[in-house]
Amino acid sequence: MAKNNQKIRIRLKAYDHMALDQSAEKIVETAKKSGAEVSGPVPLPTEKQIITILRAVHKYKDSREQFEMRTHKRLIDILNPTPKTVDALMRLDLPAGVDIEIKL
């Protein structure tokens, strides 16, 4: 008695969390307008990459500087998408700094 429910899973990644949240809201709003059920955006753990370099060129090993790069992630599930939903999502214009992975 299992239904054949279709699901679109969208993972968003970005360094800027404000652009990421705006993109997620655009996707959710577009999917809801076209008649699909939306679950999310779910915030996934932020990935933090720390890079340590020496400030001096030759010696002074104790003098170091650290830089970090944070990758923010969100997950959106679109349940029972209609062809209108898929078409609307394809035409959606999102910022350049946001990486999108779509799985059907």
Swiss-Prot record:
Keyword Ribonucleoprotein: yes
SMART domains documented for this protein: Ribosomal_S10 (SM01403)
GO biological process: translation
InterPro entries linked to this entry: Ribosomal_uS10, Ribosomal_uS10_CS, Ribosomal_uS10_dom, Ribosomal_uS10_dom_sf
Gene Ontology MF terms in the entry: structural constituent of ribosome; tRNA binding
Alphabetically ordered keywords of this record: Ribonucleoprotein, Ribosomal protein
SUPFAM superfamilies xref list: Ribosomal protein S10
Gene Ontology CC: ribonucleoprotein complex; ribosome
Role, per record: Involved in the binding of tRNA to the ribosomes.
UniProt xrefs under PANTHER family: 30S RIBOSOMAL PROTEIN S10 FAMILY MEMBER
Family named by the database record: Belongs to the universal ribosomal protein uS10 family.
Assembly and oligomerization: Part of the 30S ribosomal subunit.
Protein name from the UniProt record: Small ribosomal subunit protein uS10
Species annotation: Alkaliphilus oremlandii (strain OhILAs) (Clostridium oremlandii (strain OhILAs))
Recorded name of the encoding gene: rpsJ
